[in-house]
């Protein structure tokens, strides 16, 4: 099955995240803390914690930092109490945006998110206003040149929902979010290591932006991404370089 070209977009986002490693670590520490608080400190029985720990290790976070975040989550260390909040809104041309936050001050966070939207030509929506345009799923992206037939066989046998070959020949595998860990383990056991693997809100349809509109849309997305309380930004906007 064919799909949109997204390898460049994914690699650009990954490079930008690598350039802000300190901020990435801060976000991951929050995620590990909340995951441990909600599901316990044993990663074998806590898929969310396991995923957060894998991301932290991929980001070269020291093990001591990871363990302290887990201990803080299960009550062994003092620290801020974070709550999860999701905001929804619109960018240029009605592009849908989901902003997932972890915050210890809801009033501060909503003000900052609203300001970012309004400053860059977007606006916040109500709860549920755009979430229906996305599918909650596990997502794996493999580099162009990955053996398509072998990957498809391994993915479907592992419990994946779909395998899509994009226009740039990268391959995308999706699965139910609860099966993410099992599918990831099965794919790696079959010799397939994804460049990107995460549980995401995947847009059901995409809106492409070029030229000045692409620049404006990227500024809005960057403004949201750069907020301290923001963990993830999902959008159906595809910003063409």
From Swiss-Prot:
Its main location: cytoplasm. GO terms for molecular function: DNA binding. HAMAP family: Transcrip_reg_TACO1. GO terms for biological process: regulation of DNA-templated transcription. GO terms for cellular component: cytosol. This is Probable transcriptional regulatory protein Rmet_0785. Belongs to the TACO1 family. Disulfide bonds: none annotated. Keywords: Cytoplasm, DNA-binding, Transcription, Transcription regulation. It is found in: Cytoplasm. It comes from Cupriavidus metallidurans (strain ATCC 43123 / DSM 2839 / NBRC 102507 / CH34).
């Amino acid at each position: 099955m064919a799909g949109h070209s997204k390898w460049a977009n994914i690699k650009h986002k990954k490079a930008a995240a690598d350039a802000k490693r300190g901020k990435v670590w801060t976000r991951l520490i929050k995620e590990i803390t909340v995951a441990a608080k909600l599901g316990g400190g044993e990663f074998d029985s806590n898929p969310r914690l396991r995923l957060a720990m894998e991301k932290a290790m991929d980001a070269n976070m020291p093990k001591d930092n990871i363990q302290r975040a887990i201990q803080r989550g299960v009550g062994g260390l003092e620290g801020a109490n974070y709550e999860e909040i999701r905001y929804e809104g619109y960018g240029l041309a009605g592009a849908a945006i989901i902003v997932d936050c972890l915050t210890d001050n809801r009033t501060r966070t909503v003000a900052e998110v609203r300001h970012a939207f309004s400053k860059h030509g977007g606006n916040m929506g109500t709860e549920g206003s755009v979430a229906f345009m996305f599918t909650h799923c596990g997502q794996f992206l493999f580099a162009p040149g990955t053996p398509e037939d072998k990957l498809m066989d391994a993915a479907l046998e592992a419990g994946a929902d779909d395998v899509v070959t994009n226009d740039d020949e990268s391959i995308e595998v999706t699965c139910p979010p609860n099966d993410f860990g099992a599918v990831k383990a099965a794919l790696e056991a079959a010799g397939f290591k994804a460049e990107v693997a995460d549980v995401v809100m995947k847009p059901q349809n995409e809106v492409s932006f070029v030229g000045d509109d692409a620049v404006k849309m990227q500024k809005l997305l960057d403004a949201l991404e750069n907020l301290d309380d923001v963990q993830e930004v999902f959008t159906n906007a595809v910003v063409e370089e």
